[in-house]
């Protein structure tokens, strides 16, 4: 080691994940708290926690659980469900945490009207309407709206509209009904201008294109 040089050793000791002392969901009325706790990843300590490790707090898990709770409610008709606040407090010994999630369930909604609007290109509107799985009289479900969006964009993509978009937008009415409008933008149809094969040393490009 040359004069003036020093060796510096840095030891990094990662802190242990805090265990969950108590997890509470405030504002749940339509569903029992036990039912909501069953669908999320974070758990109270149990006999199986020592190998599942599901009673350890992690910010990423909490964020995912908040999304899970919201999706659960919005698939059960609660279109205006909202998570009002989330509080995480740690015990004095920094070994455990208390988690409190405050929610506003809102009201349940029933689908009253479904419309398809936007730029459809040369696609017949009825062909796209047949792909809509959200129907009048159904309990509002965000999952069905998302699935319809995927069906519409997939169908348009298969028809050459590679950059097509579809967005289902609910309008909530005071009478407990929801109007759903699917806004579609087919965009421009994409065409294949040329197919080039690489690596073939025997068959000519023209023959391969003709056979494909």
What are these language model-derived features?
Residues 1-212:
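Interaction-mediating elements
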């Amino acid at each position: 080691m040359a004069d003036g040089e020093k060796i510096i050793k840095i030891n990094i000791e990662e802190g242990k994940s805090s265990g969950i002392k108590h997890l509470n969901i405030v504002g749940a009325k339509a569903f029992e708290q036990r039912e909501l706790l069953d669908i999320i990843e974070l758990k109270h300590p149990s006999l199986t926690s020592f190998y599942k490790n599901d009673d350890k707090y992690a910010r990423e898990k909490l964020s995912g659980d908040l999304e899970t709770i919201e999706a659960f409610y919005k698939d059960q008709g609660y279109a205006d469900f909202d998570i009002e606040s989330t509080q995480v407090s740690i015990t004095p010994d920094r070994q455990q945490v208390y988690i409190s999630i405050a929610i506003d369930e809102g009201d349940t909604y029933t689908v009253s009207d479904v419309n398809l609007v936007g730029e459809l290109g040369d696609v017949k509107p009825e062909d796209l309407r047949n792909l809509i799985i959200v129907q009048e009289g159904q309990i509002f479900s965000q999952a069905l709206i998302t699935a319809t969006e995927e069906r519409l964009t997939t169908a348009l993509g298969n028809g050459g509209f590679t950059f097509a978009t579809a967005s289902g937008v609910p309008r909530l009415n005071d009478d407990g009904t929801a109007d759903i409008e699917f806004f579609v933008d087919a965009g421009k149809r994409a065409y294949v201008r040329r197919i080039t094969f690489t690596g073939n040393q025997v068959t000519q490009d023209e023959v391969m294109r003709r056979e494909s």
